[in-house]
Amino acid sequence: MSETYAKRLSAILLDAVTDKDPQMQEQVCGALCDFGESKPAEVLSACEEHLRLHEKLAHPYRTIILRAMEIVVSNHISELDKDTARAIILLASNEMTKVKELVSDWQQAASSVLVAVGRRFISSVMEELLSKFQPGLLPHPCTVHTLASLSVSNVFGVVPFLTSILSTMLPMLGAAKHDSMKVVFCCALQRFSESILEYLANLDQAPDPTVRKDAFASDIFGAYDILFHQWLQSGGAKLRLAVVEALGPMSHLLPSEKLEEQLPKLLPRVLAFYKKHTETVHVSKSLGQILEAAVSVGSRTLDIHLNSLLAALHAQICVPVESSSPLVMSNQKEVLRCFTVLACCSPDRLLAFLLPKLDTSNERTRVGTLQVLRHVINAAAAQMEVKKPVILSSMKLPLLDTNNKVKRAVVQVVSAMAHHGYLEQPGGKAMVEYIVQQCALPPEAEIQKLGADSEALAADSVRAISVSTLYLVSTTVDRMGEVLWPYLLEFLVPIRFTRALSPLCRSLVHLAQKRQEAGAHAPLIQYNGNVHLPSPYAITTRLLAVSSHPYVGDGRGAASLRLLNVLHQDIHPALGQRWVTAIPLLLEHLDEYSEETLSQKEWEEKLLVFLRDSLAVVSDNTWVCHLTLEMCKQLPNYNGTPLEKNFLYKCVGTTLGAASSKVVRKHLRELLETARYQEEREHEGLACCFGICAISHLDDTLAQLDDFVKSDVLRKSAGIFNLFKNRSESEANKVRSALILCYGHVAAGAPRELLLARVEADLFWNMSECFSTKVLGIKVETQDPALRLSLVQSVCMATQAICSSAHSSSFHLSRKAELVAQMVEFIRAEPPDSLKTPIWKKAMLACTYLVTLEPALEEQVQADLIHSCLHRVMAVLPEPEEGDSPQEVSAAPTVGGDPQESLYLDTVQVLKDLLTSLLLWNMTPLGLQVMLEHLSPWIKSPRGHERVRAVGLSACLLQFFLQHLQISALVPFHNLGLLIGLFSPRCADLWPATRREAVSCIHSLLYLQLTCVGFSRDYQDDVAEQLLSLKDGLVHPDPAILFHTCHSIAQLIAKRLPPDHLINLLLTLFESLGDPDKNCSRAASVMINCLLKERGNMLQEKVPEIVSVLRSKLQETQEEHILQAAQHSVFALATHHCASVVSNLLGSPLPFDSHTCTLWRALALEPGLAAQVLGLLLEKISKDVLFEESQAFLLSSTPDRVATLLPLAATCALHEVASAPASGPAVLELYPQLFVALLLRVSCTVGVQPPRQLQAKERRSASSGLASRSLEPCSSAVDALQAVLVRGGNEDVVQCMELDGGWQLLRTSAGHEEGVTRLASAMAKFAGPRLPLVMKLLFTTQSSMYEVQRVTSTAFLAELLSSNVVNDLMLLESLLYNLMARQKDTSARVRRLVLHGLANITLGSPDKVQTHSPQLLTAMIGGLDDGDDPHSLVALEAMVGLARLMDLVDAWDLHAVLLHIAVRIRPFFDSERMELRSVSIGLFGHLNKACRGDCKDVFLEQVVGGLVPLLLHLRDPHAPVVTACRFALRMCGPNLECEELAAVFQRHLQEGHDLHFGEFLNTTCKHLMRHFPDLLGRLLSTSLFYYKSSWEDVRAAAPMLTGFLVLHMEAEQRPQVDLEQLLTALQLLLKDPALKVRLKAVKTLGRLVKFA
């Protein structure tokens, strides 16, 4: 392409620089850079020319262009010729110095261009710069700045010029008047000095290795003299800081004698800057360079100023470091660098200065000093070697500091000391102890109040640092092994180091393993008289105790066990083999669980088994005695951690179990004397200890307890005057409580063969003695709740142990009645309506065990026990949640938390066990009735939570009774009807749980009856089993479903209830009509009516009385069970006067009240009568006018449709009749007529208003404040249709429609068609046999005068074709014929539905498509050409239908119309309507799919024509269009005869995969240009059409397509491209309002470089 084009393209891009959006400017810059990649010289020339010709272009835009030039130059410096470089140099120089004012971005960009060119053309750049750097004239600041930058970027090129530059610059320094210019000179001198130093440091690579520092010394000193003596004295803050920055590197170039001469003045001046500037990092950096220079020349001046230097630097290091301030952090690094220099030259004076600072109490001073000390220990290790003792001794006071920041700094110093051998010195162990102390810090000690300038320690706590330091030192510093082992063992046992146990154990394990590797058989712990080391017994006790809660303290349980395992040889030589296998199993158990999931009880049992096994392995009484002594000795250590202390008590008991009797007696006595009885939490541990010990030493244990009970500890004086001489009553109660608990645990642990003989005399008697006291000889029972709980728990444990004995059945407990009475008293004494302690649960559990023992309880005692337990448990209030309905309130108690809720559930379970235990004493129907009579008041309670609990208990009792009933002869079950009547109404309780349990009760009662009459226990009764299947229906909140289920239950009861029980059942149900739960009352009514229907022939003389009662109730109430009774009278009347009754009822006011509705439903009780009624109602609906049109207002433009009264009333009546379950046969008889009439009724009432008189009635009701049920014509028709479907046995249709929202759609104008479609689909699926007659009637409505009826019938018939049922019923031909006959209907809606129906044949009868393919294709193409549909909906349906037919029609028929279809649908690709776009593009994909045969060549033209729209609409704003494009392109691929392109489409366009559009388009264009180079022009011209698309994303995609096509085209394809047209279009896009479009246009312009 010509040079003219390259210039024009560059000009377009350069013109676009002025876009206001920064992203656009950056994109233009990028495009220029892209252009420059292939044509660097042309782009640079164009930029140079643009800037030269557009002098008035604003400097921000000039900056963008200069930046692009810099990038191009940097990337292609090797390709530039001298002329281009010269032009660029002149331009950049001119841009840089065009204005005298400083414009940073613009001038910096120009300077950067010069620096970039200078990397290769240094001579030319220097020539230009030096031309503006003339002696005697002050240069432009940017000239100096550029020289400085060049000296850094091209050291070897610039340094040879620096001698002349410095000599020229030196006189200029005096001429500089403004601080800004002086700052530039300072920066230049700094950079020049740095360049010289780098040059000198790399002389071996330098072009002139003869260059020496002396060559610059004179000029540098001259400059130094001006900077230091003039500018530093009088300049502003910014200038003074620049001077200080320059003096650092300059000091290295000063002559040695001059530097020594200047240091006395230089150092104080530099240090003074710390007080004047906030950004001190530059001062510190320069000071470090000066100090290094001074040290390098051996200056003595440093000694004089050392104190001031140290003081200033120390003040800097003590500045608080803010983590968000990198400048402060950098300053600290530079200051520490200065300290390193001073430490190397004056270590003694440095330490003399630093170490006294550690004694100060100031936080910042101490932290800063420690920071410096750590640094010099690491950085100047050689100089500090001889100072170790001094440094260690200076740490005494910091070790006592409680400040967290100081602690952290000390830990860091100790870490450094450990790595450099300090801790091996005397005093080093104190440092180790300090680290361990910090590892043991409690959480509260780590949290300090943070001030405004304080550092947060939350993320980097002292403890965390200490833990990591301890482990690091233990594992990585080899020399620390001798220091830490065995010293760290001393910290295991003291309680204050508990929190450090986990890191301690980890370190000790590592150290021990290393020592084992060094000497495998040598003992690890060498005591050698070291009294501070813990004994093996102390170690074992401590590690076992803390392992009881293994996840506390960073998982110290696992760490402790691992240490035990490593130390097994030192604990006892015999333990090795056992522990090597046992401890890993314990660790595996911990790995399998977490703190939340681990069972604490199970874990403690595992540890006790481990201890017990270890004791058995050792089998050494002396060792066991020592271990026991140590455990008892450590018990007081755990006073602050009661859970661990309780476990240690268990360990003591376990150890005593392996000891001799003498040892047991001694230690048990000591435990009793030293126990902290005032701490109730310790009682359990002490009792467990005695219980475990009793397993092996029952006599000794009981003896010690008896001795202690008889001692003075519990004795109270008989005299009133001595009452106050003994310990307080409260303390004594706590002792007695603990002792009672001990007796309980002893009973639980005692060998069962010894227990029965001792339980009454030694256990229960002593418990009683401990529980009561005597005052003046009178036995007084305490009211202390803790003491009561202890007694209850102990009785419970003792009775449970008795029951678990093999001889419990023959054991006679003489104190049984007394104990039961005491438990009942405790239960009654607890506050009602709440559950705060486990006394109820434990007392009832004790009674449960007691009940099973001989002798039997008296009836009154049983009754009192049952009443007390029920009264307490049932009355606990539930906990309502906000927004809960009564049915949703939980039966859980109001106890506020999961532990209490669990306690309640456990209590209920215990109550069930207690009642079943009592029932076992009288396993007869009478005994069952007595038990249920106790529950009866609760079953009928007005409080729901009490009912649900009582019915649940009843179900449990009945199930238990059924399972344990032993029948040796036929036993009459006299109270069956009474009991069924008790539970039956509960099947409709407000609480779902009550309903389910009630069904379970009835189920059990029916099986009890069967068992009593001789059926075997495993007999399965079909009727009884059906009850269980009805439970699901009881969960449903819909009352209709609920009571229908109750009706079903009553039917099942009626089938199995013996005749002589029927009247008792009915009388009981009559009583339930007054049940406080209205649901149960209604359920009783439903069941009464069902029983009368099913078994009324047996109660002939009772029927009139029953009906009379119900009719009288009808006048008093609206309740359902009363209304049901009235139905019989209406039924009798209607059997004789059907038409008259119907006519009179139709005259009832609308909407019908409940009385009228009940009476209508009564007419359905007999199928013959119901058929007559339905026939009359159909006549009323069909024969009268459906609606009237009238104008509500005179000025109304469209008349309102108002329903006529008689058809509306008939519809409502039909709904009521069909709603009755008994109307089913009649509905089935008239099913087609009812269905069609109601469906058409629905269609004609959509949007129709109620009759005027009804509207007036509603308004009057509203104005008077009375609630009135509104009557909506369409809803009434839908309800009637639903009722007909249900009664016709098509509940599945109703449910399907309900789930799909079909009923709601039927009621709306917008969704009516869809609703009809869903109804047809449901009918085809669930009611296929009904369709032939329904279709026959619908065919007759196809010519209805009402368009809505034609639409409805067509929609229904059309949907039927989607089901195979029409084919199975041989209705396909007639249905197709009927639909095709409606293609010319005047209604576009009908025509559209016809096409939809014809296409549905692909779903219902795909095998018939080929047979009818000519007619189907003709109909669809006719739809494409439908000209009477302004919205193209018919055409849309035709395209949808064609897409569905495509794979099934005859190939020959399809090929004949393929081209016509493709041409016809092409205009819809770019339709404004999303549906037309998506469907037409999808159909195009199907056409391609069908065209993979012989018609490829014919169809290729259409594929090529659609390729660009398909690619661009992948960016369509609507997802369905994008999906259609993906499919169409995948189908087009094979027709393009390019395997690579087809593979790309398949790989990138799969559904569900994210599409990277740019990558995909790039790959597609690459293959298009490779295989179809001749299509370039056509593709480009088509893409230009979309530059004007109304969719922003498509407009943005169009230039992308253009760019990628151009990117991949070859040179020989250039004639196909109309560059003029393309550039013009892209120029227009650069003005597009959408930023993304402009960005893509610029990107494309950058790719047009191929034409340049």
From Swiss-Prot:
Highest taxon in the source lineage: Eukaryota
GO CC aspect terms: cytoplasm; lysosomal membrane
Keywords annotated in UniProt: Lysosome, Membrane, Repeat
Renumbered ranges of HEAT repeats: 3-41, 260-300, 344-382, 385-423, 1369-1407, 1410-1448, 1616-1652
Protein's cellular compartments: Lysosome membrane
GO BP annotations, alphabetical order: lysosome fission
Pfam families assigned to the protein according to its UniProt record, in alphabetical order: HEAT_Maestro, HEAT_Maestro_2, HEAT_MROH2B_1st, HEAT_MROH2B_C
Molecular function terms, GO-annotated: membrane destabilizing activity
Assembly notes: Homooligomer; homooligomerizes at lysosome scission sites.
Primary role: Lysosome fission factor. Recruited to lysosomes by RAB7 (RAB7A or RAB7B) at scission sites and homooligomerizes to mediate the constriction and scission of lysosomal tubules. May sever membranes by inserting amphipathic helices into one bilayer leaflet. Lysosome fission is required to maintain their steady-state number, shape, size, composition and function, and to accomplish regeneration.
Similarity annotation: Belongs to the MROH1 family.
Name recorded for this polypeptide: Maestro heat-like repeat-containing protein family member 1
Taxonomic classification: Eukaryota, Metazoa, Chordata, Craniata, Vertebrata
